[in-house]
Amino acid sequence: ATDDNGHLYIGDIGNNSNTRRDLMIYIIEEPFPTQTVVTNTKKRISYYYPDQKEIPAKKFNFDAEAMFWKDGKIYVLTKHRADTYTQIYRLDAFNSGEKRPARLIARFNTRGQVSGADVSPDRRKLVVLTYTSIWLFETRKKSDNYFKGKISWLPYKAEHCEAICFDGKELIIVNERGDLFQLKVEDLISIRE
């Protein structure tokens, strides 16, 4: 994820077995690819899910691969293994070295495991990638709960797609092999206005 001030957010947020106690997001200055050899971590954000009552959790619902930045806050979308839901959590405070609770915002059945997400430049749209479909959520107001607004969707067939981002009126998707796919936002099917 990136913010408006040239920072790159790197998530060490994977938790396949739901046993991790050290979920971390690193903030660095976004390096210039041809000139930067080494970069320093500006901040480390340690967090936990308050609704994960035991480690490991009996339901494997605390893994994550997707996150985005919006208006000074970091959002993480979970990748459930016990069901096909995702949950959006928000991290409000970025005090380095202090473990902070992630605040649960909303829950939605994506009918698959979430592998990527991005927020549009105007912050009104959230695109969510699963292994079998693309979801587009649009808020009606300045809300954190994208799942209550307009929803569009599109199934796809490509192997192990792991990342998605907005590029104007298009979406760019990449899989584990490095293949890039391009899709017009208008091609998604509206399922709720």
Indicate residue ranges for each PLM-predicted region:
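Sequence/structural signature of beta-propeller domains
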Residues: 1-193
